[in-house]
Structures are given as C-alpha cells and as structure tokens.
C-alpha cells in the first residue's frame, strides 16, 4: 500500500520566497515616501500645537508669550515657548529630517499678546530634507492669531 506524502517541495518554497521578495522590493519605495509625508505632517502638527499653546497661554496669563526658534546641531531646528516672566512653557527638541523656513527670513520669534494676537504674522514652510518639492506643508498665523496648516508651499 502506498501512502501519499503531504507538504511543499523545495522548488515551491523557493518560488514563494522569490515572489515575496519581489513584492517587498516594490513596497519599500512607497513606504519611504509614506514615512516622509508623515514626518512633515508630524512637524507641522508640532508647530501648530505649540503656536496654539502660546496663544492660549497668552490669553490665560493676560501677558505676552513668545515662541522662539532654537538651532540644534547639524542644522536641526526646534523651538521654545516662554512666558513674559521667563518661565519655559514648552520645549520642542530637534526635528530630524525636516527643514523649516520662516518668512520673512529675519523672524526668529513670535510673541502673542494678552488678546491672543501675534505681534508678527510669519509663515513657516516645512519641507522634508530628501525631497523638498514633494512633501511640503505651510503653517500660517492668521490676523486673529490662530495658526493654520495648509498642504503645499507657502505663497
């Protein structure tokens, strides 16, 4: 009496491994661009939330609150939110892999007054360092002082 063996042959397993390798090779570039898009989104959200925090703290404290840029090693940027009395409210560490451009270029800080309005209304363009033309977000400060995030370059 003959029994049948069940299982896979070595050739079948090698074909499956080769197909999985090809599919993985096709998925890696799209995953990289997805990670870059998410990196820019995260940076713009962090800036947006820090600007919103500075505005709400200025209203709550009935005094000026300033968001100032900080330059870290390797041209990485972050910022610090401070009250008029010098108290540090929030510190944002270095954001790796993104470039933040402030327009106008000579703006290094934004101060919110007790009314919630900013003394200046700069725009922040956030780019990914590897492909700056594809993944760009713009964070603006409206006349009311509220920050606003837009897809694409600042115009």
Protein language model annotation of sequence segments:
Residues 2, 14, 26-56, 60, ...:
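N-terminal helix-rich module
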Residues 6-18:
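N-terminal signal-anchor/signal peptide hydrophobic helix marking the start
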């Amino acid at each position: 009496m003959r029994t049948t063996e069940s299982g896979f042959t070595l050739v079948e397993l090698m074909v499956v491994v080769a197909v999985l390798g090809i599919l993985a090779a096709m998925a890696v570039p799209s995953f990289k661009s997805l990670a870059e898009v998410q990196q820019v989104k995260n940076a713009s959200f962090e800036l947006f939330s820090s600007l919103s925090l500075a505005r709400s703290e200025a209203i709550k404290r009935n005094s000026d609150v300033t968001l100032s840029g900080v330059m870290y090693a390797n041209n990485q940027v972050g910022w610090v939110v401070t009250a008029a009395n010098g108290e540090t409210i929030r510190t944002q560490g270095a954001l790796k892999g993104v470039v933040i451009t402030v327009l106008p270029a000579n703006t290094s800080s934004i101060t919110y007054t007790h009314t919630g309005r900013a003394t200046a209304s700069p725009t922040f363009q956030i780019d990914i360092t590897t492909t700056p033309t594809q993944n760009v977000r713009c964070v603006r400060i409206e006349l009311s002082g509220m920050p606003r995030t837009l897809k694409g370059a600042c115009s």
